[in-house]
Structure formats: structure tokens, C-alpha cells
A protein has these predicted regions:
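Membrane-interface segments of envelope glycosyltransferases acting on lipid-linked substrates or membrane lipids
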Residues: 1-147
Length: 147
């Protein structure tokens, strides 16, 4: 039997948040013999959906959490991860604040399709908010699809 297409879902956690719940709704209802989801999360903590993801055949990979001061190591972690995991047909990013880093790395790794999925209505104030706005700027130029 043909191996399923693998899609990497990029999230902050596998907790009970809105994006995580919507992705899990999709995951439960797709034909997993044809498409499989794996998850890249930015926490070392176990998430609410971890056991279910693994039971459905998905893998969970833990990458470092982005901080302004770790831009280069964060990008290097993604570059290394994607070099080791060339099985993905798509990287679907739900974290638009850092998508301008990891989606270009996915393109660099020859991932066929990259998608940025923004659900956020805004940004915080202060330095973090300014950084988020700057990183989101021109995101549509760095990915195949912006939703």
C-alpha cells in the first residue's frame, strides 16, 4: 500500500487552544491512510492532545520556543529538523509570528507546499508586538498560501 502524504502542522502546543482543536477536528476526520499529520510544537511540556495524536499515527516533534535573542539558533533548529525530515509534502504553519522563519526554511528544504494560517486578530503592545508585526510583514511573499 502507498504511504500517506505527511503534513507537518506547526503549533505552539498541543493543548486545548482554538487552532489546536480545529486541527484535531480535521485530523480525526481525514482519511489517514491517504494523509497523516505530524506536529511541530514549541514546548517541552506534554499537551492535551499528545496521546490522541500518537494513537492516530502522528508524531510530535519539539522545537525550541522562539525568543528574539535566539533568532539564529531557532532558524538553525528548523533547518536541521527539515533536513532530517524530508518526508513532508506540506508544512502548515499556525504560528504566523514565526512563520517568516520556519516557512522559508521549509521552502529551502524543498517542501512542495507551505501554508501560513493566521487566526490572530492582532498583536500585543510593546517590543514583542512590534517584533510580531515586523515578522508578519510580507509573509505572503515567503509562503505558497496565506490563509
Amino acid at each position: 500500500m502507498k504511504e500517506p502524504i505527511r503534513v507537518l502542522q506547526v503549533l505552539g502546543t498541543t493543548g486545548l487552544g482554538g487552532a489546536e482543536s480545529r486541527v484535531m477536528d480535521l485530523y480525526r476526520n481525514i482519511d489517514r491512510e491517504r494523509v497523516q499529520f505530524d506536529f511541530a510544537v514549541h514546548t517541552s511540556k506534554k499537551g492535551y492532545f499528545d496521546e490522541e495524536i500518537e494513537a492516530l499515527g502522528g508524531h510530535i516533534y519539539r522545537l525550541p520556543r522562539f525568543q528574539v535573542y535566539n533568532w539564529i539558533p531557532y532558524r538553525a533548529a528548523w533547518r536541521s529538523f527539515l533536513k532530517e525530515h524530508s518526508e513532508y509534502a506540506c508544512v502548515h504553519g499556525h504560528m504566523t509570528s514565526t512563520a517568516s522563519i520556519y516557512l522559508p526554511e521549509a521552502k529551502r528544504a524543498k517542501i512542495a507546499l507551505t501554508a501560513a494560517h493566521a487566526r490572530s486578530a492582532g498583536t500585543e503592545g510593546g517590543v514583542k508586538g512590534m517584533m510580531t508585526k515586523w515578522m508578519r510583514k510580507n509573509l505572503w511573499k515567503k509562503t505558497d498560501v496565506c490563509l
